[in-house]
């Protein structure tokens, strides 16, 4: 790669690093900025990127990508920690949204966490009810749509395989996106069932397979994101009701924190992508203005 273009890659890396550090600083518990510490971090980052000049250009791109992803994950983990500790009220971050789902999702409004007009959930609901709710969702015109289905879908017998399920789910998602193309859709993984729930339906043993299929669908669908609840389901297993199906009031803040952290993660990734694109555009302009050495 020509020297000038190679240096542009390093410059782009510096810009991205500075932006990520600036955003991370805003996550401080008291909102204070330690200028000296921030400057030291930036200086270390610049020194690191300058040292990359001795490396192969193909390796540099991968190293910078890994650094960005690591930093984004650290910021995501810090936000989750702040939400879990109560430093930030998770409910204050639910803005311009709609949440749809089954009886488990009903708890968000039943326990008074979120307003009823933003929680379109019913006991026994499946994604077929979601399809019926599309006009209501469109009327609210939300930026973020949270979908919390799956418990009844797995046991009802309409979709005998995970593949059958996501095939119809994808069609419904496409219907929503056709009318709300700018909305982000966040699909909650299916919370597990626990004993004695399996006495009611052994199909719930297959919940992990259905969730995995939903993840695959999200991975291949633009503006559709999978929210993995496995970690919080394991950590707060004691917050399931005695029926092994529903969850107690105290579980909802943890579930909400997981949902809203994914929204935050997507916003970070979008900001990172925009910064990278801006840096690349600047590189293209410089390349056209000056010949490579």
Question: Over which residues does each language-model region extend?
Answer:
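N-terminal secretory targeting modules
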Residues: 1-94, 110, 266-293
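Active-site-proximal beta-strand/loop segments in catalytic clefts of secreted hydrolases
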Residues: 100-103, 120-123, 148-152, 188-192, ...
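Acidic/histidine-rich helix-loop elements
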Residues: 112-130, 155-162
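Alpha-helical scaffolding within the catalytic cores
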Residues: 127-138, 170-175
